[in-house]
Amino acid sequence: MVKFNLLFALLITPLVCFGQNAYDYYGEKVQLEAHYFQSQNAGKLQGDKKLSYQGMDISNGYAVSAQSTGVITVYDLNGGDMSKEKQLKLSTFSKTANAYNVSFGTKKMTEEDVLPLLYVSGNHGVLNVEQIEKKFKNVNAVQTITLDAKFSKIDWAVDADTGFLYAFCTNKNGTHQIMRFNVPEVKEGEVSTVKLKTSDALDNYLVEKYYQGRSMTSTHGVYVHDGQLYITSGNGTPNDASRLYVWDLCGKMLRNVIDLSTATRDELKACSVHNGELYVQTQSSMYKLIF
């Protein structure tokens, strides 16, 4: 039986009850559907076997799974199963390119597009905005966004509920910064460059100022849902287990740390919500946690 350990903020030890693949937990609620969850394997990833998996997001029943070099695979989740639809290359595709985090925005470039614009966190903190054309025919560059501050890594995510753009930044000393911006405007038929300044941030704070618990090491991707920032971390090893941190963006506090080390010994790369279920991507498969 798969067993989950949940750790909560303020170093509270949780009480966990186990049933038929359903796991009850106590503490602050992960705000999806209920105060318990089930775990299911949604399917094996079918991308390029030679490349590592990175970011993932879901919109309109389609999951876009990104890999190093800028290859993306589109999966159709509408039929209940995870079926491969198309494999494409981002406009930034190259041998050294990365798509550490991918996040759907709130705007489509054209009415015919099935998916909203895709915000791709690449090398050196650069954020590339991409249009996936209707019927997944091609991927086009729309905008390049940079930030005037230097960090070891920046994972960008759009909050589909509020329309704000979040930057989860890793400092050189291992601490983390959260910044919130308005989403820069895009125009059809125009590829633009936007240079954000730290002074443009609507909010900017150090996570460790509000939280002194378990260090967030080996963070991979971020996702915003219902006022909470989901942070995937860990390499799936005994010394660096796969964990999902849930950060309250309004209260500026850690709500949960979900330990998935016994569910998967793989890297936990990305997550996204679809039909009230939290899909998580590892280096081999997609799982869904049904809350």
Question: What name fits each language-model region?
Answer:
Residues 22-48, 85-97, 135-152, 190-216, ...:
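Surface-exposed loop and turn segments in beta-propeller and other repeat-based domains
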Residues 205-249:
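Loop/turn-rich, solvent-exposed surfaces of beta-rich toroidal or solenoidal domains
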Residues 70-76, 124-133, 173-183, 238-246, ...:
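Structural motif
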Residues 267-291:
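Blade-level signature of beta-propeller repeat domains, shared across WD40, Kelch, NHL, RCC1
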Residues 40-70:
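Beta-strand-rich domains and repeat architectures in extracellular enzymes and scaffolds
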Residues 48-59, 95-115, 151-163, 215-225, ...:
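Structural signature of eukaryotic scaffold interfaces centered on beta-propeller domains
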Residues 62-65, 111, 117-120, 164-168, ...:
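Conserved beta-propeller blade signature
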Residues 67-69, 107, 121-124, 168-173, ...:
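Short loop/turn segments immediately following the C-termini of beta-strands
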